[in-house]
């Protein structure tokens, strides 16, 4: 809210099962969107394609509890995707999203390095990948996000959802 930022949150089905519904509802009320990140945070490229599709559908049904008008976005866990997975994604009218700015925030526990890397590499239209901090998990991302949002504002870059980005680029 402080930076008038909106985002697309790629959510796994397993995360939905372990999150208070009110937290997801509040994300949506604040102008954010939620999108499909499949059931588990695993590299589905190594999983039978039928399980991939079943997990994709299951996650979509969980997400539909919060929004009947879900965005069409999908992001493969670990950015690992096969041709067969891509076909299934298209079959379900989803578009696979790949970010162009990722500071490996899951492995580098340094908020200043993460934010500096992102701010150095971001440009208008960039899709930044940063993982949600949680108590005890990736807590360094709280500070990284604060630094990034402040830096993006200083660069006069608007922080929008993927749907808004697509709409702006179509103009």
Task: Describe the residue ranges of each PLM region.
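Active-site beta->alpha N-cap acidic-glycine motif
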Residues: 1-43, 47, 51-65, 71, ...
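Terminal accessory/targeting
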Residues: 1-8, 25, 120-171
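A cross-domain feature marking catalytic cores of carbohydrate-active enzymes
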Residues: 11-13, 36-38, 76-78, 100, ...
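Acidic-and-aromatic substrate-binding clefts and catalytic sites of carbohydrate-active enzymes
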Residues: 11-19, 42-50, 75-81, 104-111, ...
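Solvent-exposed, polar/charged alpha-helical surfaces in well-ordered, non-transmembrane soluble domains
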Residues: 25, 54-57, 61, 83, ...
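Conserved, mostly hydrophobic/aromatic
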Residues: 34-37, 59, 74, 96, ...
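Basic- and aromatic-lined ligand-binding clefts that recognize polyanionic substrates
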Residues: 65-81, 85-89
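His/Asp/Glu-enriched short active-site or ligand-binding loop at hydrolase and phosphoryl-transfer sites
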Residues: 80, 86-121, 157-168
């Amino acid at each position: 809210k402080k930076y008038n930022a909106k985002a697309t949150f790629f959510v796994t089905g397993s995360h939905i099962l372990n999150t208070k519904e009110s937290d997801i509802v509040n994300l949506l009320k604040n102008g954010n969107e939620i999108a499909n990140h499949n059931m588990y945070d695993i590299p589905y490229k190594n999983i039978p394609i039928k399980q991939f599709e079943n997990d994709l559908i299951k996650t979509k049904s969980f997400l539909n509890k919060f929004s009947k008008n879900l965005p069409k976005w999908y992001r493969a866990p670990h950015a690992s995707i096969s041709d067969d997975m891509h076909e299934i994604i298209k079959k379900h009218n989803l578009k696979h999203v790949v970010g162009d700015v990722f500071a490996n925030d899951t492995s580098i526990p340094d908020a200043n390095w993460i934010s500096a890397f992102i701010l150095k590499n971001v440009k208008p239209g960039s899709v930044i990948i940063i993982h949600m901090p949680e108590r005890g998990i990736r807590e360094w991302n709280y500070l990284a996000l604060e630094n990034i949002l402040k830096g993006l504002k200083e660069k006069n870059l608007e922080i929008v959802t993927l749907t808004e980005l697509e709409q702006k680029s179509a103009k």
